[in-house]
Amino acid sequence: MLPRAVAHISAAALDHNLSALAQRSGTRLLLPVKADAYGHGMELVGRLAAAHPDVWGLAVATPQEAETLARLDLGKPLLLLTPPAPEELGALADLGVRLPVSTLAEVEALPAHAQAHLKVDTGMNRLGARPADAVAVGRALAERGQLEGVYTHFATADEPDLSFALTQLVRFRSVLDALPPVLAHCANGGGVLSFGRIEGMSLARPGLAAYGYVPEHLRHVCALRPVMTVRARVNQLHTAYPGETVSYGALWRAERETGVAVVGMGYADGYPRNATGRAAVLIGGERRPVLGRICMDQMMVDVTGLDVGVGDWAELWGEGDLSVTDVARWGDTIEYEVLTGLGSRVERRVG
């Protein structure tokens, strides 16, 4: 069957971004591909990234993601970022997945053949050991020959005020200084762009930045490219006459004869319903408004005067004149939520 909506993943853009971020950080990359590679397709992106010389390994959030990637045998280290259930440890270790550890109890439960990365909570108050406790955990892992790396996560590195991120870095260094030399990583995308090379770090973990999206105040640092372009087909064309309304709630009313294209993308596909009244698409070479409420499976677009046919494509966001940042703003949300919310009915393909 023909896809009704497609997310085109640019291998060239991803390759460019990975090279630029590795150069900026001065390290190799541990690329997060969690949440279906931020909506881009975990297996697809995993294969592309594994072929890049600047990528040391891949990082995921759940044991299920880890198992899926490990079975692809991509030839790169794979780090699970969040603690698995105790009964999952053996299977993950058998697959070669690097495991996160932050307590002495987790050290004791770790299979003897597993490698671990010590997670340090330097201020995020999410996961990890506080610095005062982390050293003992790290030393216990090192004594067992299982400490491959140490990591933390910045809470504010993508903000203009970097004072708290610098405090976190000081706390992280206090742990590193008390442990034998191992892989160390702390910089997310904001950290890479804000700080550049951080002395003593072995890896960087740029998430959304690797896919081409960064806060506006950091865009001048690296010329990153959006990796994803989303397009959906025109399913039907008709005319709305003066006085007629379009979509649920009858919110939009035609003041003139209006060409209407029904485009196969809706909130069930991840397009934010909150963008109603503000959203637009690129179609027939122009930016045109979405009419009325966005529906579950489709949206209606004003194509008056355009040469558009059934089966033509409308661009929802991409590298051109309409970005996912626009869509997120219209939907009162953030790029992360739009991208990771992209539905399974949208086919991911390279090109």
From Swiss-Prot:
Keywords of the record: Isomerase, Pyridoxal phosphate
Residues bearing the modification N6-(pyridoxal phosphate)lysine: K34
Catalyzed reaction equations: L-alanine = D-alanine
Needed co-factor(s): pyridoxal 5'-phosphate
A Gene Ontology molecular function term of the record: alanine racemase activity
One GO term (biological process): D-alanine biosynthetic process
Top EC class, one word: isomerase
GO cellular component terms, A-Z: cytosol
Pathway: Amino-acid biosynthesis; D-alanine biosynthesis; D-alanine from L-alanine: step 1/1
PROSITE patterns with a match to the protein in the record: ALANINE_RACEMASE (PS00395)
Database matches in SUPFAM superfamilies: Alanine racemase C-terminal domain-like (SSF50621), PLP-binding barrel (SSF51419)
EC number from the UniProt entry: 5.1.1.1
Summary of the function given for this chain in its UniProt record: Catalyzes the interconversion of L-alanine and D-alanine. May also act on other amino acids.
Family to which this protein belongs: Belongs to the alanine racemase family.
UniProt name for this protein: Alanine racemase
Protein's organism: Deinococcus radiodurans (strain ATCC 13939 / DSM 20539 / JCM 16871 / CCUG 27074 / LMG 4051 / NBRC 15346 / NCIMB 9279 / VKM B-1422 / R1)
Lineage: Bacteria, Thermotogati, Deinococcota, Deinococci, Deinococcales
Primary gene name: alr
